[in-house]
Amino acid sequence: LSAKSQGGRIVLRIEDLDAERCPRVYADLLEQDLAWLGLTWDEGGSTGGAHAPYYQSECGDIYTQSYRKLEQKGLVYPCFCSRSQLHAASAPHTSDGNVIYPGTCRGLTPEEIAEKRKKKAPAYRLMVPDEAITFTDGCMGTHTENLLRDCGDFYLRRADGVFAYQLAVVVDDARMGVTEVVRGADLLSSTARQLYLYRLLGLQPPRF
């Protein structure tokens, strides 16, 4: 309603980064449910538009370009930690229940990385500074999060090559010209990380 009242356009983006877990039939059912509710959109997978592709599973090459920019800044490093290892270490958790990464692999030497690669493929994390980011959400007010203490170095890419949600949504919002994002409270804790990515990539963030 906010977008329509201001002459904006609604983009239906399908966030199916993990194509195996999110088969296309789920997206089809989603569109059917939205249509049943009387909700319409101007651009999307079934309708087309100027900002295709609308399925994140088809955007790997686009995400790679931004990922390479972060690599060139020296902020990306390989991580060999498993989820079970992080939980076993009793690492602190974020407000959404995720483990705050303690930086276990942040300081690995080239020799240590080469040795660990012999046993398993790494995921890749973005190094974050000890910096507080304050933002105002249109529904939930002003919030402040410290990137290092409240979020920790976060995933950009899984070991199987699938890009992480945080990077994908930032790149997609920018390339689609998204100016306003409405989301649930469960995604509030993602905002500081996304704002940091917008800054690193030189992109204009939307209003939340």
Language-model regions, residue ranges each:
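N-terminal Rossmann-like or analogous alpha/beta NTP/dinucleotide-binding catalytic cores
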Residues: 1-90, 94, 185-205
